[in-house]
Amino acid sequence: MVKVPHLLVATFGVLLVLNGCLARQSLGVPPQLGNACNLDNLDVLQPTETIKSEAGRVEYWDHNNPQIRCAGVSVSRVIIEQGGLYLPTFFSSPKISYVVQGMGISGRVVPGCAETFMDSQPMQGQQQGQPWQGQQGQQGQQGQQGQQGQQGQQGQQGQQGQQGQQGQQQQGFRDMHQKVEHVRHGDIIAITAGSSHWIYNTGDQPLVIICLLDIANYQNQLDRNPRTFRLAGNNPQGGSQQQQQQQQNMLSGFDPQVLAQALKIDVRLAQELQNQQDSRGNIVRVKGPFQVVRPPLRQPYESEQWRHPRGPPQSPQDNGLEETICSMRTHENIDDPARADVYKPNLGRVTSVNSYTLPILQYIRLSATRGILQGNAMVLPKYNMNANEILYCTQGQARIQVVNDNGQNVLDQQVQKGQLVVIPQGFAYVVQSHQNNFEWISFKTNANAMVSTLAGRTSALRALPLEVITNAFQISLEEARRIKFNTLETTLTRARGGQPQLIEEIVEA
């Protein structure tokens, strides 16, 4: 007979197991992904789902894939056609994006921040310097002027005082909104959780943007399913392969009368906001000119020089506003060769952006690396010390090998344009191009991601004493010297053939 204490212990253990399973399901982890980080076999990934709209489409990678699920991210590719507008949307997770192709303008809505972009040109039929008036105010304007002529001097002074106060409170703005910025090929765009953003394609080709949501980020207080919240637009095709019902914007769920009272509009207009019969999707085509208040487009060199002024931290060019969340920069172009962190004329270049170059990344805890590898070149073997890496090929092809913690090769494939590779934290990898160039963008789940190389001048092997190397690998002292000192580069090298370069031939920044 089983004793009562033993039975209680067994029952308690079963309850703990069931509670763990229910908790995992409540976090959005499907039962088949109970061991989501079993990464013994990685693969090159492509989009599995496409959501089409009137003026573009959004392609999604399966976020239930064990590799993507383990990294705690969700990846999508947004294609906006010429004249297309990606309607205001926000997410429960922070988002980092890279503009692969094209140009446009984008805006974000930061709650609590003022509208700092204003168009002060008067409306049609409005005199310069006078506040805007509605239709009723215009109809009664003549009567008010006649009444003013009959008033005494004291009444005129009192009315002028009231008009002056109203003029200070309400100026003749046609429109006023939060910050609008130009975006172009090579831009990194960072968006905080809960901040709505929109994008309009101003170019003559499709605007292509690769996006990453960090759904494991501390800012996401929901489950590990990517959730899209729309201020406008809809998704008539459903949210995913498992969720086929139509998704409406957030205003659709309110009673139209309540919405009309909140916005002080009529019920008919409130129903228009709910887009009940609109099937255009979340990317719509703009008919006619798209007129928003925006600054003129800078020259690329002038823009970078303004963002990164030379001189000490207390430079006179720094006005101190960049530390506020309302005016904090969200864009940084990392495709300019002059911005390269590592540059070798015959091999390629690597550029990183982190919280030091784009402070908002410290808040969302993400960073990015842009790389261009020429033919017959190699990125020396390395691993990420404190981040997962999601590598996306923007051009060309290359061979990528990944080794796990057991020393097993878990990936050895050719990666081509439009494909994705997840490289978990601590997994060593090497990138090798052949005849074709290889270009990529990597998103990393740390604001200041660090790497450690396994070969080269700053590698882990270079830092070890010769005696440690000889005893670890059972080799001679001369062989240990060759292992330590034959590769003089730090990041990029030749992929095949040739003799080791002299230090004088290395050009790295």
From Swiss-Prot:
One of its GO terms (molecular function) is nutrient reservoir activity. SMART domains: Cupin_1. The keyword Mitochondrion does not apply. Residues 124-172 have a biased composition (Low complexity). Residues 119-175, 230-249, 301-321 are annotated as: Disordered. Disulfide bonds join 37-70, 113-326. SUPFAM superfamilies: RmlC-like cupins. PROSITE patterns: 11S_SEED_STORAGE. Residues 42-271, 332-481 form the Cupin type-1 domain. Belongs to the 11S seed storage protein (globulins) family. This is Cruciferin CRU1. It comes from Brassica napus. The gene is CRU1.
